[in-house]
């Protein structure tokens, strides 16, 4: 039974019923698109409950069915979030990059890549590898700059870090 049918949360049930009604009423929505959306919705529900293996399984099914690049980018992004939560940072980076290939303006993916690169830079610094740390910090800065160009009112902490480290070669401030 799909997760959406097992949910005891009234708001989630209401959303599920409304989404199903909208999908039934929209002309031109194929059964494949409906299935992809159901898997994606179930993946999000499982992810929000910390059921990451189930969420990944649903996202993989959604990815196999979904044709739209933007929708695929969000599926890949959510898979990246799960791998990041599990501490699989390199795998998370792979999924964020795949999401960006499909949707270059996906600010949350740009930000998360920057966060992970910055974290890796901090680890390199702690290990005494200043050269690698500096390269990772510079790469993180480039992703934050891209995100800030798209959404100048977001990522205030990143903007402050860019300014304080002298990496703010950007005219959005």
From Swiss-Prot:
Membrane topology: Peripheral membrane protein
Domain of life from the UniProt record: Bacteria
Matching Pfam families: TPR_1 (PF00515), TPR_8 (PF13181)
InterPro entries: O-mannosyl-transferase_TMTC (IPR052346), PSI_Ycf3_assembly (IPR022818), TPR-like_helical_dom_sf (IPR011990), TPR_rpt (IPR019734)
SUPFAM superfamilies referenced in this protein's UniProt entry, alphabetically: TPR-like (SSF48452)
Coiled coil spans: none
One BP annotation, GO: photosynthesis
Gene3D superfamilies named in the record: Tetratricopeptide repeat domain (1.25.40.10)
Keyword Repeat: yes
Keywords: Membrane, Photosynthesis, Repeat, Thylakoid, TPR repeat
Compartment(s) where it occurs, according to its Swiss-Prot or TrEMBL record: Cellular thylakoid membrane
TPR repeats: from-to residues: 36-69, 73-106, 121-154
GO cellular component, one term: plasma membrane-derived thylakoid membrane
Family recorded in the similarity comment: Belongs to the Ycf3 family.
HAMAP family, A to Z: Ycf3
Biological role stated in the UniProt entry: Essential for the assembly of the photosystem I (PSI) complex. May act as a chaperone-like factor to guide the assembly of the PSI subunits.
UniProt xrefs under NCBIfam families: PRK02603.1
PANTHER family named among the record's database cross-references: PROTEIN O-MANNOSYL-TRANSFERASE TMTC4 (PTHR44227:SF3), PTHR44227
UniProt name for this protein: Photosystem I assembly protein Ycf3
């Amino acid at each position: 039974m799909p997760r959406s049918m097992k949910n005891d949360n009234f708001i989630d049930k209401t959303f599920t019923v409304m989404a199903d009604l909208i999908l039934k009423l929209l002309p031109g929505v194929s059964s494949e698109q409906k299935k992809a959306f159901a898997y994606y919705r179930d993946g999000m529900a499982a992810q929000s409950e910390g059921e990451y293996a189930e969420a990944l399984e649903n996202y993989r099914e959604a990815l196999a069915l979904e044709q739209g690049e933007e929708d695929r980018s969000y599926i890949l992004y959510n898979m990246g979030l799960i791998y990041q939560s599990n501490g699989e940072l390199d795998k998370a980076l792979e999924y964020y990059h795949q999401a960006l290939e499909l949707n270059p303006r996906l600010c949350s993916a740009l930000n998360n890549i920057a966060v992970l690169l910055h974290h890796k830079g901090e680890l390199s610094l702690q290990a005494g590898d200043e050269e690698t740390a500096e390269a990772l910090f510079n790469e993180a800065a480039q992703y934050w700059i891209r995100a800030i160009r798209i959404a100048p009112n977001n990522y205030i902490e990143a903007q402050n870090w860019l300014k304080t480290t002298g990496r703010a070669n950007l005219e959005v401030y």
